[in-house]
Amino acid sequence: MNNTIKLIIAIAIPLVIGLSGGAFTAAEIPGWYAKLQKPSWQPLSWLFGPVWTTLYILMGIALYLVWKSDAVQSARQTALILFAIQLTLNFFWSIIFFNQHQIGWAMAEILVLWIFILLTIFSFGKISQTAAWLLVPYISWVSFAAILNYTIWKLNS
């Protein structure tokens, strides 16, 4: 498989997962989510889509750099497994928070997600420093999202 195809696939994977998770989110924004008490510093709702799209593209490029690398198979395999775990956790956070309305459980889940993103960054860094750095905006945004999740949880408990 040539590198162009690998790049397209690598970017498509997080985008498709993200859009799938977004399907659970979109329906709840005007109803349940709009009724929640939220902090004054929460970003405008329209900002989340472009931010997540950008992050999913960066994740895909990072995935591509690891996938195409000549790193030892075991290191690459570990990195790809960690990436898959964090991407799965990313998907399920939307379901837990928006679809199931379980803000507390979503808080617990996002902490586990954060740990797996960090493990993925370290694992990617052993293979490609660029790939690791491409995930820094992602963990930064998830850190912010965790603080927002916690604040919404406390405001609505």
Predicted region positions:
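N-terminal signal-anchor transmembrane alpha helix
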Residues: N2-F24
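Hydrophobic alpha-helical transmembrane segments
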Residues: T4-I8, A12, A79-A84, M107-A108, ...
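Membrane-interface helix termini and inter-helical loops of multi-pass transporters
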Residues: A27-S40, K68-Q73
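Membrane-interface loop-to-helix entry segments
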Residues: P43-L58, Q102-L113
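Helix-adjacent hinge/juxtasegments
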Residues: I57-S94
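Membrane-interface helix caps and helix-loop-helix hairpins in membrane proteins
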Residues: Q73, W93-G104, K126-Q129, W153-S157
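Hydrophobic alpha-helical segments of small multi-pass membrane proteins
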Residues: L80-L87, A106-T120, Y138-V142
